[in-house]
Amino acid sequence: MAKATGRYNLISPKKDLEKGVVLSDLCNFLVSQTIQGWKVYWAGIEFDVTHKGMALLQRLKTNDFAPAWSMTRNLFPHLFQNPNSTIESPLWALRVILAAGIQDQLIDQSLIEPLAGALGLISDWLLTTNTNHFNMRTQRVKEQLSLKMLSLIRSNILKFINRLDALHVVNYNGLLSSIEIGTQNHTIIITRTNMGFLVELQEPDKSAMNRKKPGPAKFSLLHESTLKAFTQGSSTRMQSLILEFNSSLAI
């Protein structure tokens, strides 16, 4: 039976570029230096990454901190008092958040192959390396990943960023303040703080939290401003009050 197609319909290249993402966008983490930090381009999204908060992390880790900050240090002993923990750059924190957003899609949706496999590889690349380019060798993946699929991936990443924005700052009232995602080789924990998002990467068994024999952990801080441009609404009054209540948090 003959079927109708839109094979020769004219499209607006500019409009398609604005809405769509190509595979190379997912496989390139392009970084350029700015006065305050870096500009990062990934999946058709431009992020402004700043150094803000990193000096505080270093001081908390090296015991060079004001007494009023001890609450923050004691809240995360597996990071600040662990000889096996290391501080990474904010660029690393962004990579981990993006990898977590991809993993979140893999967990929540029944994605077909080769899309699921391709996303898993891209997530591992972001999570375990600091290289700017990932070479996707599989031609089958390139052929089957449509513009619509790639745009959906970007859309889901932006939804994940909004989920992070909806978290409450760490507090004593039991409100949700962290997102935790486990992969085969890692545990990712992203926690909302006054200054932004404290990002940590641990072993799958979270051995870093073992007080007697703490395992390895990597962590960093991504400032609030980096993700704020992609969130849908301003903080609610409740969030603002909690931010104020927790102003004694060093970060």
UniProtKB/Swiss-Prot annotation:
GO terms for biological process: symbiont-mediated suppression of host innate immune response; viral process. It holds the Pfam family Filo_VP24. Keywords: Host cell membrane, Host membrane, Host-virus interaction, Inhibition of host innate immune response by virus, Interferon antiviral system evasion, Membrane, Viral immunoevasion, Virion. One of its GO terms (molecular function) is structural molecule activity. Disulfide bonds: none annotated. Its main location: virion. It is found in: Virion membrane; Host cell membrane; Host endomembrane system. Belongs to the filoviridae membrane-associated protein VP24 family. Interacts with host importins KPNA1, KPNA5 and KPNA6. Interacts with host STAT1. Interacts with host KEAP1; this interaction activates host transcription factor NRF2 by blocking its interaction with KEAP1. This is Membrane-associated protein VP24. It comes from Zaire ebolavirus (strain Kikwit-95) (ZEBOV).
